[in-house]
Amino acid sequence: GIPLYILNAGDNEVVRIDLLIEGGRWQQSQRLQALFTNRMLREGTRRYSAAAIAEKLDYYGAWLELSSSSEYAYITLYSLNKYLPETLDIFESIVKEPLFPEKELGVIIDSNIQQFLVNSSKVDFLAHRTLINAVYGDTHPCGQLVQKEDYHLINPSVLQSFYDRYYHSGNCSIYLAGKVSEDAIRRIETLFGSEPFGKDFRKPEKLSYVPVTSSEKRIFTERADAMQSAVRMGMLSLDRRHPDYLKVRVLVTLFGGYFGSRLMSNIREDKGYTYGISAGIMPYPDSGLLVVNAETANEFVEPLIKEVYHEIDRLQNDLVPAEELAMVKNYMLGDMCRSYESAFSLADAWIFIHTSGLPDSYVRDAVEAVKTITPVEIRELASRYLCKETLKEIVSGKKMS
């Protein structure tokens, strides 16, 4: 059977149903296949046209979200309890019998190509693409960059084959959150638990890829008409299951993860090189990517990069003052509290823990890591994990002589 997880919380007569399919970019046989398979589910099924789906959901005050990640596809329905029989009927049809109609697919691909071309003229988009390709390489799903031609290679049969392989009852789980009634549980069990659906009942094989990092330290992508340059600095970092990860998160927040961070205080407030600079760890299935992000006037690119290294030096050599560390801790603990306030944000946390293969104690461990970390540990972690030599420098903008 399909695992069904229930989180009954909240006072409003609303529920959210998340159906997760194990099949994302990691599993696709060509670029964009996972994304468009998921995106096209609402564009017509055996029982409903795209217009009927949109109209009915609207009429019942329901909301459908489709998204896909490295290893999962998400189909999410928000519905009022009183209309759940009607909205679940549409939801079931979307999951079990999509048609991937050619006309609707053509329209969506055209609008995605337009968006891609608009993005391709933006320096931050170019810098980000260049960075992940430099860090992961062409053979890794993260480093494989979508090109305009890839959109033209998507057709209904490409999507149908991905759907047939991954969208089935042997490869999904359901999360039900909000004010959950016995009736809601019974309906979901009837629709999804009584008989298997889909064609292929194999679980996907767990795939792992080895990053092939470029040897270049600095990579420049030119946009001759750019008023500003985008700067991305990045390197491979810890994955979420690493024992040091939760404490490194505190270090990275202090470095560039909130408004009072070192990078903001120095490079924005003090030097005025940029309106905003940040650092964070982007999580992927088997690694993290530490990224420093900024946009700046072309003439400030070099001084900005120099100051980033200066802030790394300070973290590696000096102890963080107690009051500054207390401020970061308060910020992070407050942020965590806000993340677990509502039934739906709790469901998000819970899905995140399951899909990342983390222990159930993860939230408790995260709070503990923030509360207990010391200035000495911050300095040690900075020396171990903020490695200036491996940090790539990507600049996208106008060439300065």
Model-derived features: where do they sit?
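His/Glu-rich zincin catalytic helix
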Residues: 1-55, 160-266, 305-309, 390-401
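Charge-rich, well-structured scaffold segments of protease-associated domains
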Residues: 52-203, 239, 269-401
